[in-house]
From Swiss-Prot:
Residues 570-582, 604-622 have a biased composition (Basic and acidic residues). Residues 12-36, 568-590, 603-632, 678-704 are annotated as: Disordered. The keyword Nucleus applies. This is Zinc finger protein 518B.
Length: 1074
């Protein structure tokens, strides 16, 4: 029958006669397979041309059966509409259902008689919606009305065939051939990366992923397993037994967490490495490769440090069946069990020793793109070997009790005690370079529902011993964290953030420090710059050690806080003489994530930061559990161009923090405003910002040489940051994180001036008179009343982002000596406050340099007694001014100050009512939908500024009025500098203002249009419509989205856009209907 069918179709093609309807696709029941090689076209029909000219194929219009008939019979058998009707249907009897499908596969044609041709075609190619007049291919789903196209298509099938090598089945399409091969091999050509689902087409995998593995529109696997799929050919050739479990994954589960924390264990053919455990949440961490300079452990005593070790684990899955080789395991393991994130662990064998199950695991490093290029020293030529024992295979033995409590035995790379590292080990470890670094960030705010810390603080204190910890040359970055609410500890110097399952992790996490022989005081703070690559890290805790990198990759979407690490290329000869010592400022800042993160200011190792770097900020976020209150804004645009200005989301999230003293805060802000316009206070402010951080034992008697040394280094540095060496005896850092004046200056002069004198000529144009050291303490003396220091009562201390284009990099030194018990600095426990100048774009571009002066004005502190301290302050200010090389900056500073004073004068009048300071809200934008796109507006695109109800305050009203005065030069709309200074608003992320008690009751005015701007230039906006004067006028509500407008025209134009969008395709529909 197959030959007959081919003859019939070929007859039609060669005969050139077009039948009225071709047969529907009904491929062979006998099923011809197909191979993956091309063959020459074969002419299967060997009849005469005369017969081909006389015979053709026709399809019955009623029963859809295919018949081979002559042209004469075709002309006779056509019905009323020119359709061919077969003999049985023409009799008027009820046609049988598909009577052409005959069980007899040997139907033949004798002579010129026409018989029912049962095209034994595969049922998968049956045409569901058969339409007369179309040609249907019986080998695939192709159909066309053009007979020439149909002829070309059928010829392609004769040329391209796929023959199965197992059974000689002939297929004509690749998809059918792959479907057939699954019967023989059992392996699908496409695999789901999150589960064992396989398919013959990739679009099936895409649909499966969307249907099964996506939650709330965000693509993430059900199990947070970072899957690194190995090459299937490599594993099957090297280890045939691995095919028993093609997707082995072992997840170490935390039974206190809601989700599994995935550690992918995959197979490969490469040789074995013994690398520390790197937990890898898929969405937030990147692969890390440690590349030593081809050094191995050579001495016998070094090898003894890394010994086999039994680790007891609890098997969770499989629970009801015995553990067998090749099956996936889910175990709860302590921190001692280390499996690299870029390695695969395959269960090879199960042994029983003394009634205990021992599972033999085989480790394979993956061959995929985990091996990045080595650092500058290696040039990408070094091998991926970390503490390798020299054997091609290393085995880990999991031994379990009869109660499913397993232990792991193997070359785990155990570090036998924190103080057991000998200098020989350190010499080997110091050459390890990091070519890539993790992003440690808590994945989602919704995960931190318990509000607890990862690891108990008791566990942390066990590892924070006052021993010689070596945090500098370990194979992994080390972090020591301490604090009552501390959450994060590095297991083997890697934060065990457990991916999405970031609930408290009760197991022990040994913090292994292996470098730099430096004493770690439990209450003192030290910073580790070690050889790390660009990283943006966020850690839990208030104090600690952080890696430092050459570049500051500030991610605006996921990474909360940029932690920049300064890495060095030069080798350290001696552990005790390293200059990776810096003094950092620690502050608690309300960050945008609902877990606690750590930001540290670091300078290190006589290495200036790159021009693009920013000083680091140490921040500690507040935990907020209420993420749903506040209106949802469907479209919010940033009012300045650039990728860093893209808003995080479009939903306001408010976390309320009470201010202890409303009146004192109001007076403090008023004093800051008053001092903005005094030119004489500018120099004293700059000098005082330095002297505050250096004041010791109740006086601020900084010598002129010291001040000049600082100013020279700061002025010459430009964007670079000088290093601050630490005395060898660690005397500079005390329990309260205070530095004496005598310890700072000599090392400061040595550490920074020698590196920056060469930069003075190139970077001099960057320096400005606004020199504010990173971390200077804000102390405002309420001069009208008693002389006690006002404590910063807001939970978020002052932290102002810095703009490198307008301001030079200040050196982050600043811990201040607490001398008088009556003077309350800002939370000694939290450390001094970050006071880097905030250069946001004010109303005129030239005013950008002045904004920091108006925002962070330091009044004389209680450390300076009366007029004597004030005069000393002025002396220091004069010395500071002399040290600045560019004299014209001073006159420009005074000129800009007067302009700024005029602009700030009007907003300052709105601070009479203390009720507006009752509640400070932290406003953050969150996307209402996971797939919502937020982007900056394009040029000439009208921008509508929508404000949260809490922003509807006299403060914002006056700011808008001031902006309206400068219609041609609006760079962006922000709150006033003093508000950002006092409440620590992070640029581009948080909107923070005061809520008036009266406006809080007006809930119906949740979404109020404040101003409409038009983008007239790349960085400029023009005010199209100003603020309505009468706030009590009628409010119009949008019918579509519920947005409220005070202006009727705006409300109408807004609704018109909705109407246009809703009826965009109506004209197409109406034309089709006609």
């Amino acid at each position: 029958m197959k030959d007959i069918g081919q003859q019939l179709y070929t007859t039609h093609l060669n005969g050139g006669h077009n039948s009225l309807t071709m047969s529907p696709k009904q491929p062979d029941a006998n099923g011809a397979p197909r191979p993956n090689r091309q063959e020459a076209q074969t002419l299967l029909y060997q009849g005469s041309e005369a017969e081909a000219a006389m015979m053709t194929i026709a399809t019955c219009a009623k029963c859809k059966s295919v018949h081979k008939i002559s042209l004469q019979d075709l002309q006779k058998g056509t019905g009323k509409d020119g359709m061919y009707v077969c003999f049985q249907c023409s009799l008027g009897a009820a046609p049988p259902n598909f009577h052409f499908v005959s069980n007899n596969s040997s139907a033949t044609h004798v002579g010129n008689k026409t018989e029912n041709f049962s095209s034994s075609v595969n049922s998968k190619f049956k045409v569901r919606n058969f339409k007369p007049g179309k040609y249907y291919c019986d080998k695939c789903r192709f159909s066309t009305k053009d007979p020439l196209q149909y002829k070309k298509h059928t010829l392609q099938h004769e040329e391209i065939k796929f023959i199965c090598s197992h059974c000689s089945y002939i297929s004509y399409t690749k998809g059918e051939f792959q479907r057939h091969l699954v019967k023989h091999t059992g392996i699908f050509p496409y695999q789901c990366e999150y589960c064992d689902y396989g398919a013959i087409r990739n679009d099936y995998i895409v649909k499966h992923t969307k249907r099964v593995h996506e939650r709330a529109g965000a693509k993430r696997p059900v199990k947070a397993v970072a899957k690194l799929e190995p090459k299937r050919t490599g594993t099957s050739k090297q280890n045939p037994e691995l095919l028993k479990a093609s997707n082995p994954r072992t997840t170490f589960q935390n039974k206190w967490s809601d989700q599994l924390s995935g550690f992918s264990l995959h197979a490969n053919k490469d040789k074995m490495h013994n690398i520390m455990l790197l937990p890898e949440p898929k969405e937030y961490q990147k692969d890390v490769v440690c590349i030593p300079n081809k050094m191995t452990l050579s001495e016998p005593n070094e090898v003894n440090l890394f010994e086999n070790k039994n680790v007891e684990v609890e098997v969770l899955s499989p629970a009801k069946e015995p553990v067998q080789p090749g099956m996936p395991l889910t175990v709860v393991a302590p921190a001692e069990l280390v499996v690299p994130a870029n390695c695969l662990a395959q269960l090879i064998d199960v042994k029983v020793v003394n009634g205990t199950q021992q599972l033999v695991l085989k480790l394979f490093p993956l061959e995929e793109n985990n091996c990045l290029e080595a650092g500058r020293d290696n040039g990408g030529n070094s091998e991926r070997m970390v503490k390798e024992k020299g054997s091609n295979e290393q085995e880990k033995v999991l031994s379990a009790e009869k109660t499913k409590s397993l232990t792991v035995d193997g070359n785990v790379g155990k570090l036998v005690g924190i103080d057991s590292f000998q200098p020989s080990v350190q010499k080997q470890l110091k050459n390890v370079k990091w070519v890539r670094s993790y992003d440690f960030i808590m994945p989602n705010s919704s995960v931190h529902n318990n509000g607890k810390s990862f690891i108990n603080s008791e566990t942390i204190e066990d590892f924070q011993k006052k021993n010689n910890l070596y945090p500098h040359r370990t194979a992994f970055p080390s972090v020591a964290l301490k604090g009552h609410s501390l959450a994060s500890v590095f297991k083997n110097s890697v934060l065990r953030s457990l991916g999405a399952a970031s609930n408290p992790f009760p197991y022990k996490a040994a913090v292994c420090f292996a470098e730099s022989g430096r004493n770690l005081h439990s209450s003192s703070q030290q910073l580790l710059p070690f050889a790390a690559s660009p990283a943006t890290c966020s850690f839990s805790g208030e104090k600690g050690l952080l890696p430092v990198s050459e570049n500051d990759l500030e991610s605006t979407s996921k990474v909360n806080i940029p932690v920049k690490v300064v890495s060095s290329n030069r080798k350290q000869e001696d552990n005790q003489t390293e200059e990776h010592k810096a003094v950092s400022t620690v502050g608690q800042i309300s960050s945008q994530h609902k877990s606690e993160y750590l930001h540290i200011n670091i300078t290190g190792e006589d290495r200036s930061q790159q021009p693009g770097d920013k000083p680091l900020e140490l921040k500690n976020s507040e935990r907020t559990n209420n993420t749903n209150d506040g209106p949802v804004i469907s479209s919010v645009f940033s009012l300045s161009s650039g990728s860093e200005n893209v808003p995080e989301g479009i939903k306001w999230n408010s976390s309320t923090s009470k201010i202890k003293s409303i009146e004192l805060l109001r007076r403090k802000i008023a004093q800051l405003i008053e001092s903005c316009g005094k030119p004489s206070s500018l120099a004293s402010n700059s000098a005082h910002r330095r002297s505050v951080g250096q004041a010791s034992k109740g006086t601020s008697k900084a010598t002129s040489e010291g001040i000049q040394e600082i100013n020279v280094s700061l002025t010459g540095l430009g964007h670079s940051t000088g290093t601050l060496q630490k005395p060898p005896n660690d005397g500079g850092i005390t329990g309260n994180r205070q530095l004496t004046h005598q310890q700072i200056y000599p090392h400061f002069a040595d550490g920074s001036n020698r590196k920056t004198k060469s930069r003075v000529a190139r970077k001099a144009h960057v320096a400005t008179p606004v020199l504010i050291p990173k971390g200077a303490v804000l102390r405002v003396l309420n001069s009208s009343e008693n002389a006690h220091i006002i404590e910063a009562t807001c939970e978020a201390p002052v932290s102002i982002p810095c703009s490198e284009r307008q301001l030079i990099k200040p050196v982050p030194f600043c811990p201040v000596r607490q001398a008088d018990s009556d003077l309350q600095p800002l939370r000694s426990e939290r450390g001094p406050i970050d006071m880097s100048p905030n250069i946001e774009t004010p109303l005129r571009p030239k005013l950008r340099k002045e904004s920091a002066v108006c925002s962070t004005i330091h009044r004389k502190t209680g450390l300076l007694y009366g007029q004597q301290g004030s005069s000393e302050l002025n002396k220091q200010g004069r010395l500071l001014s002399r040290s600045l090389s560019i004299s014209r900056n001073k006159t420009k500073q005074v000129h800009l100050s007067r302009k700024k004073n005029k602009i700030q004068a009007e907003p300052s009048r709105c601070l009479k009512d203390p009720s507006i300071f009752q509640v400070a809200r932290q406003l953050r934008l969150i996307a209402a939908k996971p797939d919502q796109l937020i982007k900056c507006p394009r040029r000439n695109q009208p921008v509508i500024v929508l404000n949260h109800p809490d922003v509807d305050s006299p403060e914002v009203t006056n700011v808008m009025k001031v902006i309206n005065k400068y219609k041609g030069n609006v760079l962006k709309v922000v709150l006033s500098e003093r508000t950002r200074c006092q409440l620590g608003i992070r640029r581009h992320h948080v909107r923070l203002t005061y809520q008036n008690a009266e406006e809080a009751s007006q809930i119906k005015r949740q979404m109020m249009l404040k101003m409409k701007l038009k983008k007239v230039h790349k960085n400029n906006y023009q005010v199209v419509d100003s603020l309505p004067d009468d706030s009590s006028q009628c409010v119009f509500k949008c019918w579509f989205c519920g947005r409220l407008y005070e202006d009727q025209e705006e409300w109408m134009s807004h609704g018109q856009r909705h109407l246009i969008e809703a009826t965009r395709d109506w004209d197409v529909l109406s034309s089709k209907g006609k």
